[in-house]
């Protein structure tokens, strides 16, 4: 259950819907079907982050597969910064060719698995 102020903040930060009324993922620029919507904290909650953006589930999982919470807090506090990450750019080019409701299991990057 959310309070009135949190609902207003969330509504103000929601991505602009397209003609079909679906929000648009700020990473891949595709409409997000209701069952594929995930809230992503730009700065992880464990690091004091409050602001969220609505992402495709597959995009959200890819962000966390590639980056640690420390990296998200330090270097990737904005969507534009996430889009500029080299591995994320490669992923976004690939996922843009998929249907809006496409989902595939995401694995941690080898760099993160080695930690």
Q: Would you name each region that the model predicts?
A:
Residues 49-54, 62-103:
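Polybasic, low-complexity binding patches
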Residues 1-24:
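Short, charged surface segments at domain edges that flank catalytic/cofactor-binding sites
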Residues 10-15, 66, 113-114:
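A periodicity- and composition-biased signal for non-globular, repetitive helical segments
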Residues 19-54:
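Histidine-centered nuclease catalytic patch
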Residues 12-15, 43-46, 78:
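A general structural-boundary detector
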Residues 98-115:
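A mid-sequence interfacial segment
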